[in-house]
Every structure is written in C-alpha cells, then in structure tokens.
C-alpha cells in the first residue's frame, strides 16, 4: 500500500469511491491524499481544507473490502503531518457510529450538533455531530 497526494487524474476514481462510501467527493481545491494498492487503484482517500492553523476534514472514505487495515488512521496522520494544524474539525452523520468510533480513536471529541445537516436519498434529513481534534503541544 502506498499513500500519496492525489492528482487531477485520480479524481474520477475518487469520486466513484466517494459515492460508494456515501461521502462527498473531493473538490479540486481540497488537499487530498489517497492510499493505493500495488496496481495503483485507490483503496481510500482523505480530503481536507486547511485555513490558517486549522484543518477541516471534509471526507474520509475507505473501500469496504479494505476497512479495518489502518488506512484511515494512516491517511489522517499523513494529513496532520503535512498540514500541521493546531485544531481540526469535521462533521459526521449522527447514525454513523463506526466513523464516530474511529474519530474518537484518532483523538476527536464531540463539539457540537447540526440539525438536519445531511440530505438522505428519501428526501429526509439527518443530523450531524461536529467533532474537534486538538494538537498536543510539543515543547
């Protein structure tokens, strides 16, 4: 497995992966890294938006067959190492308990709530939990 910055040529495959994982596809202005298998096919990606000393985690997607292998953790650490944020924020579906557990393991804490934030295919809406990560100060 290789982690590398995504290129414009990767975007179609990442958009397909995003749809399969029910997350927003990365945009051309986002900072995106992907984890690829030996053939170069994307297994996972993380998309972030840095602003000053903060980072917004916009999307984190892992192919179902590639989950529970540490890809999300490795991608998150790659983004943190590259962007060096003091603080990071994200929104996650209230029903996505697996993602919430992952984010808690990565050091995120519950920070707020957004009512009716996510649209559902049936026209209903779902709440989002806002989570916050804080860098550990180094001396």
Question: Predicted segments — roles?
Answer:
Residues 83-94:
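Conserved GNAT acetyl-CoA-binding A-motif
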Residues 89-91, 109-130:
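Conserved catalytic-core motifs of GNAT/GCN5-like acyltransferases
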């Amino acid at each position: 497995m290789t982690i590398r910055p995504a290129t414009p040529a990767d975007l179609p495959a990442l958009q397909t992966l995003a749809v399969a994982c029910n997350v927003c596809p990365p945009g051309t202005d986002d900072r995106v890294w992907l984890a690829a298998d030996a053939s170069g096919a994307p297994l996972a990606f993380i998309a972030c938006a840095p602003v000053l000393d903060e980072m917004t985690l916009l999307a984190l997607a892992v192919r179902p067959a590639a989950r529970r292998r540490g890809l999300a953790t490795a991608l998150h650490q790659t983004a943190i190492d590259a962007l060096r944020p003091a603080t990071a924020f994200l929104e996650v579906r209230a029903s996505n308990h697996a993602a919430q557990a992952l984010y808690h393991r990565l050091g995120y804490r519950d920070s707020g709530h957004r009512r009716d934030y996510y649209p559902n295919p049936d026209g209903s809406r779902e709440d989002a939990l806002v989570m916050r990560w804080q860098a550990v100060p180094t001396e």
